């Protein structure tokens, strides 16, 4: 290594003066480079101290109130060294005292022996402190320099560091000149040259550029020798790589090779989309296997969409992956749909915050062991297991979900899963549960008694198409912040028992399709529902074919604009009590009470008066809007007994109390 020294001279001062010379040395490790190195990297280092000949007037210190003084120093360093630098401090010799060389009695100002605040320094002593420290430390001898600073990366221009020399004097200090010298040594930290691949999206572009209409990549691996001169290559090294990395396609064996002098190749911090094959795109879609054994992933922070869409991969070995620094695994393995098994036991997920869609559409995976997953920092689990239709069991008992805010579509389409134990889930921060269990059509039990839904805003289609579930108890649900409940229970065709007694719907704006096609439920009490903010009730109770009673006694529909198909196909109902309903804003009544068959039982609709159809009339009667409002309701009669033999032809005008000269389908019940 080379050493650079800057020697600084001392000032000669008057009686009882203290002279402190600061010597400074800057040192950098000498790096040797072979002639084949592609991107020559040369480390540089510069440093300075602003006060190289500090002096103190001892008489002034002794005559001061506290008999103490502080001498500020500013150490400035500038280096491009990628591993940073180390700064040390020591005296010039083993002598750490400020000495009076003319004294016949050996007068001196000793170094403090332990860390102390300035005011507590012993008489006639000195020390140093660095940065924000409040204590002064002993002056180190030359043989035992003190490390005052160590960094891990290059500086951003000049980096300034504050130091202070402190001392305390007494009246018995012998007159004279007291001197010593401090040496600051700045050394660049050792730097090992490495090969680093370019950022993921750039790598992806270059990998795809190798393919032609006739030449497709089927294999990916490290080449043992450099490519022939005749081979068409692309560079995939990062700008900070110390080695050139070549990538090429050998049409003979359909293999994409990369070559670099080193055995190990570091992946970029951003390794997102490295092997991403977009939906509908044919580039790199034919890759059958990836040899990743020479990849070092210890510096990677982003692995989002890393292998996404590689639908022909049947095996993927990640056993050598170091993911200890990764924060983003969004869609990492999404749509690698031919995988049947994958071993993730080596993955360290302790820093991951986004794990959304990680296993999206792994439709052929039959086993998945996540017992080692640390999810304590994860905030996003949206779409995590979306479309894993062949998985029959999953154990999430080790999951820490205390920071998760998004669980949208988390288990969407896991249609072969019969049980799901979420008893360990902490959902106290979750805001989005929409589509969470959508189309889990084989699920027969679901216990959510531990769910804290106090922060949830969106429950759209949360249980949509969970068609094998017969009972669902949500009596613990806090829905006070929910704004969207549309299709929440849609197509739960086997549900016979539903407990929503705790539901607070005061902020809900959309209830369209909420209970649509809940075909086996016979009784539904929603008397506690507050619907003041709801604007859409379209298909809310559509095709509840076994429904016999429904209590909507406190429904406020003043802001509703869409009531289309609201009670359509509810063929087991004999009467509807809609006395709380008003319709000043409704624009669409299409199919509201319609049935697709004349085999239905509805005979009476009770209201407190005629309905306002002015908005609907303005909107017009254009299919499907405002048409077939009472289709096939052949048993329905109005207040005075009026009915129509052709209910399909009855229009909006029948949304009124039946009376002489004004026939209608409503019966007055004040």
Q: Where is each model-derived feature located?
A:
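Signature of Gram-negative chaperone-usher
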Residues: 38-192
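Residue-level recognition of conserved structural "scaffold" positions that shape functional pockets
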Residues: 23, 34, 47, 113, ...
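Sec-dependent, cleavable N-terminal signal peptides
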Residues: 1-40
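Negatively charged
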Residues: 191-670
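N-terminal cationic amphipathic segment used for targeting or macromolecule association
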Residues: 19, 24, 35-37, 45, ...
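Intrinsic-disorder/low-complexity coil detector
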Residues: 7-8, 12, 42, 71, ...
């Amino acid at each position: 290594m080379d050493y650079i020294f800057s020697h600084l001279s001392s000032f000669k001062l008057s009686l009882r003066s203290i002279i402190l010379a600061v010597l400074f040395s800057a040192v950098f490790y000498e790096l040797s480079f072979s002639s084949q190195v592609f991107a020559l990297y040369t480390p540089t280092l510069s440093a300075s101290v602003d006060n190289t000949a500090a002096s103190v007037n001892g008489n002034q210190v002794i005559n001061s109130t506290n008999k103490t003084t502080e001498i500020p120093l500013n150490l400035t360093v500038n280096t491009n060294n990628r591993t940073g630098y180390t700064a040390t401090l020591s005296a010039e010799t083993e002598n750490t005292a400020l000495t009076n060389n003319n004294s016949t009695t050996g007068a001196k100002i000793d170094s403090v022996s332990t860390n102390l605040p300035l005011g507590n320094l012993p008489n006639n002593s000195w020390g140093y402190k660095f940065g924000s420290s409040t204590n002064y430390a002993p002056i180190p001898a030359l043989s035992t320099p003190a490390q005052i600073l160590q960094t891990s990366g290059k500086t951003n221009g000049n980096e300034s560091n504050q130091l202070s020399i402190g001392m305390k004097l007494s009246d018995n200090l012998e007159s004279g000149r007291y001197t010593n010298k401090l040496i600051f040594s700045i050394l660049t930290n050792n730097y090992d040259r490495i090969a680093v691949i370019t950022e993921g999206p750039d790598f992806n572009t270059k990998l795809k550029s190798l393919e032609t209409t006739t030449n497709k990549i089927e294999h990916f691996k490290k080449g043992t020798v450099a490519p022939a001169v005749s081979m068409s290559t692309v560079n995939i090294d990062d700008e900070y790589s110390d080695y050139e990395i070549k990538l090429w396609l050998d049409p003979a064996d359909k293999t994409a090779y990369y070559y670099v002098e080193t055995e190990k190749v570091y992946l970029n911090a951003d390794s997102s989309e490295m092997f991403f094959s977009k939906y509908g795109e044919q580039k790199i879609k034919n890759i059958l296997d990836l040899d990743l054994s020479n990849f070092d992933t210890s510096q990677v922070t982003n692995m989002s969409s890393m292998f996404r869409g590689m639908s022909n991969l049947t095996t993927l070995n990640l056993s050598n992956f170091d993911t200890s620094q990764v924060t983003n695994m969004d869609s990492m393995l999404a749509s690698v749909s031919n995988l049947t098994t994958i071993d993730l036991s080596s993955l360290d997920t302790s820093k991951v915050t986004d794990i959304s869609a990680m296993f999206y559409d792994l439709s052929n995976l039959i086993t998945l062991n996540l017992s080692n997953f640390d999810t304590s920092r994860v905030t996003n689990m949206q779409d995590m297991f979306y479309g894993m239709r062949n998985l029959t069991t999953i154990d999430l008992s080790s999951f820490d979900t205390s920071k998760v805010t998004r669980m949208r579509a988390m288990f969407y389409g896991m249609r072969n899963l019969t049980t799901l134990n979420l008893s360990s889930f902490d959902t106290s921060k979750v805001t989005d549960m929409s589509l969470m269990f959508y189309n889990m059509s084989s699920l027969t039990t679901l216990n959510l008694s531990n769910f804290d839904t106090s922060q949830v805003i969106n429950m759209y289609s949360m249980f949509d198409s969970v068609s094998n579930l017969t009972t669902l108890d949500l009596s613990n649900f806090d829905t006070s912040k929910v704004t969207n409940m549309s299709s929440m229970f849609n197509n739960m065709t086997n549900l016979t028992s539903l407990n929503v007694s705790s539901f607070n719907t005061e902020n809900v704006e959309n209830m369209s399709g909420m209970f649509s096609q809940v075909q086996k439920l016979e009784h539904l009490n929603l008397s506690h529902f507050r619907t003041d903010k709801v604007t859409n009730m379209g298909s809310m109770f559509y095709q509840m074919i076994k429904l016999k009673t429904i209590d909507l006694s406190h429904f406020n529909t003043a802001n509703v604009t869409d009531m289309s198909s609201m009670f359509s196909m509810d063929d087991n109902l004999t009467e509807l009590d809609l006395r709380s309903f008003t319709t000043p804003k409704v624009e669409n009544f299409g199919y509201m009470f319609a049935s697709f068959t004349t085999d239905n039982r509805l005979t009476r609709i009770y209201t407190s008066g005629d309905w306002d159809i002015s908005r609907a009339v303005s909107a017009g009667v254009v299919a499907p809007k405002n048409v077939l409002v009472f289709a096939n309701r052949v048993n329905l009669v109005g207040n005075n007994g009026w009915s129509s033999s052709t209910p399909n032809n009855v229009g909006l005008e029948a949304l009124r109390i039946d009376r002489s000269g004004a026939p209608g389908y409503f019966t007055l019940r004040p």
